[in-house]
Amino acid sequence: MFVNFKYFSFFIRTKMDGVTGGGTNIGEAVTAPPPRNPHPATLLNANSLPPPFLSKTYDMVEDPATDAIVSWSPTNNSFIVWDPPEFSRDLLPKYFKHNNFSSFVRQLNTYGFRKVDPDRWEFANEGFLRGQKHLLKKISRRKSVQGHGSSSSNPQSQQLSQGQGSMAALSSCVEVGKFGLEEEVEQLKRDKNVLMQELVKLRQQQQTTDNKLQVLVKHLQVMEQRQQQIMSFLAKAVQNPTFLSQFIQKQTDSNMHVTEANKKRRLREDSTAATESNSHSHSLEASDGQIVKYQPLRNDSMMWNMMKTDDKYPFLDGFSSPNQVSGVTLQEVLPITSGQSQAYASVPSGQPLSYLPSTSTSLPDTIMPETSQIPQLTRESINDFPTENFMDTEKNVPEAFISPSPFLDGGSVPIQLEGIPEDPEIDELMSNFEFLEEYMPESPVFGDATTLENNNNNNNNNNNNNNNNNNNNTNGRHMDKLIEELGLLTSETEH
């Protein structure tokens, strides 16, 4: 390779002259001009203007047209983003040329804004106040620490500066994201509390439902037991033919006892006489399985009629006098079944007829004979008692008797007796009737023998028209014999 030494030597000589300062032109060309200082007025104008981000944010919040999306708070020291989605879609592109709400929040964080309320997007800064826009120039941007002077000379310092810058950027990012994380944590806590309340409520409802199910199961068990009892009862009734009849017998007897108890409370009601006679007719089931008709007792109805007329006979007050020696208490007799007759039970002489209502009079007390001296009377022996009236006001009453006119209505005792059938035991009663002569007291009830005979004959004629001929003849013979005996007793008493 051939080199031109002429040019090479010239180049070396020129270079040496520039280093030693021998040439002025070359030295002037090599020396760089000094830097220019900025004008003081330009620096003042640059420091008096607020950052563009703060100015745009202030104008956006101050605009009344955007109050539905972003507006000042009631205290006018902060602003609130009411609708972040619409804020990102409409306002951010208009003022900041992007639509990222997170970038807007990070930018606020770099200028020192803080989130006031965790439940909403409310930001505040000491220099960001409503109506005081000139305070925006006091808000400064946070600077990241970076070493530019010694970065080329010291690699370690350069790495340190880069690490510090990354830490500053990381801290700023953490500070910006802190608001969102805290808000999310608070929201999650509130949601957790709501879920816990709902869980407690659901557990209470479950416990209540379990209790109701247990009660329902108990009710079902009781219903099953009752159903089994009903089925066993029906099976027993079907298998045992006498079971149902016995059950009906028991119910009928219970109803009869209730009816008999009600009879005693209706003795003084005149209007219920016919109802009482019909209420005693019950269908009873006999022991042999046949249905028989229960008939009311003749002596019971006769006694009821006498008790109804007790107010018309004041002379009966002597029977309830405390000076009486003895008396008789009438008891109800059980119904006769299967053709068997039951006798009346004799009552001790100490039991008077005190249950008969009476009024006090001045008549002397009448002594009743002891029941032990009277032969036991059967029900059949009393059934053929005559139905005549024993008083006749048309006859003259002997002086030995008290006139019954003050005690009677119309001169007769209103005793109503039903038709009494014939009883074969009346003959035995008539044969033993003579013992009454020594115990028969003087009483104004029966009058003289003539009156009794006339009344008995009239009533016997009426009975003959209604009854059969055979029964009437038999009753007539019995009544004639009874009248004859009563007449003899009365005549002996008068003499």
Swiss-Prot record:
Gene3D superfamilies: Winged helix-like DNA-binding domain superfamily/Winged helix DNA-binding domain. GO terms for cellular component: cytoplasm; nucleus. PROSITE patterns: HSF_DOMAIN (PS00434). Exhibits temperature-dependent phosphorylation. Phosphorylated by CRK1. Residues 146-164, 454-473 have a biased composition (Low complexity). A motif (Nuclear localization signal) lies at residues 262-268. Residues 50-144 bind DNA. Residues 272-281 have a biased composition (Polar residues). InterPro entries: HSF_DNA-bd (IPR000232), WH-like_DNA-bd_sf (IPR036388), WH_DNA-bd_sf (IPR036390). One of its GO terms (biological process) is response to heat. Residues 140-164, 255-288, 445-477 are annotated as: Disordered. Induction: By heat stress. It comes from the Eukaryota. It is found in: Cytoplasm; Nucleus. SUPFAM superfamilies: Winged helix' DNA-binding domain (SSF46785). Constitutively expressed. The keyword Metal-binding does not apply. Transcriptional activator that specifically binds DNA sequence 5'-AGAAnnTTCT-3' known as heat shock promoter elements (HSE). Belongs to the HSF family. Class A subfamily. Homotrimer. Interacts with HSP70-1 and HSP70-4. Binds to CRK1. Binds to HSBP. This is Heat stress transcription factor A-1a. It comes from Arabidopsis thaliana (Mouse-ear cress).
